[in-house]
């Protein structure tokens, strides 16, 4: 194994749309070590517990479980993989969706309109400890935490 391969960030993908997952994984596979994927809450928690990815791309609206979607996955996965960082990747830019996963501990939130290059950059940034938000969401997040 080359030095470059050993340095790849371990990434998992959670989304209930198989074709979307496949497309994202195809985009990311040259840059990251894709260690797992899942489509629902119970499968996601199990996959994260088993693979212990460094970063999870997490859709907000995922079926199963108790109806909490991405926030529920994050909360239930934490005990099994406490160092995993979560980056929400969703079509939704609704304040309640953004707030739910950020309050649950996600390191960032980007929308599915993101380019492949920007998604790769966002994954690297959250892995390094930075918070990442789509430009459209950054103002909302700031105003929420500033009490505006």
How should each PLM-predicted stretch be described?
Residues 1-10:
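Non-catalytic signal-transmission and effector/linker regions of two-component phosphorelay proteins
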Residues 9, 18-36:
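Two-component/phosphorelay signaling modules centered on CheY-like receiver
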Residues 16, 89-93, 112-114:
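Conserved active-site segment of CheY-like receiver
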Residues 32-41, 47:
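Short hydrophobic/Thr-rich beta-strand motif most characteristic of the beta2 strand and flanking loop
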Residues 46, 67-83:
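Short amphipathic alpha-helix used as the core "switch/output" element in two-component signaling
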Residues 54, 61-64:
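The short loop immediately C-terminal to the conserved phospho-acceptor aspartate in CheY-like receiver
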Residues 59-61, 90:
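Active-site residues of response regulator receiver
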Residues 96-103, 108-148:
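Short, flexible helix-to-coil linker/hinge segments that flank and couple to helix-turn-helix
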């Amino acid at each position: 194994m080359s030095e470059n391969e050993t340095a790849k960030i371990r990434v998992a993908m959670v989304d209930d749309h198989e074709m979307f997952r496949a497309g994202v994984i195809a985009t990311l596979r040259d840059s990251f070590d894709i260690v797992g994927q899942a489509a629902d809450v119970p499968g996601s928690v199990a996959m994260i517990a088993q693979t212990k990815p460094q970063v999870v791309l997490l859709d907000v609206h995922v079926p199963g479980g108790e109806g909490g979607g991405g926030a529920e996955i994050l909360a239930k996965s934490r005990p099994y993989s406490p160092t995993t960082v979560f980056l929400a990747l969703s079509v939704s830019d609704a304040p309640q969706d953004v707030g739910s996963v950020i309050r649950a501990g996600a390191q960032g939130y980007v929308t599915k309109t993101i380019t492949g290059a920007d998604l790769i950059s966002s994954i690297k940034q959250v892995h390094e400890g930075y918070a990442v938000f789509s430009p459209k969401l950054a103002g909302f997040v700031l105003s929420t935490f500033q009490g505006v």
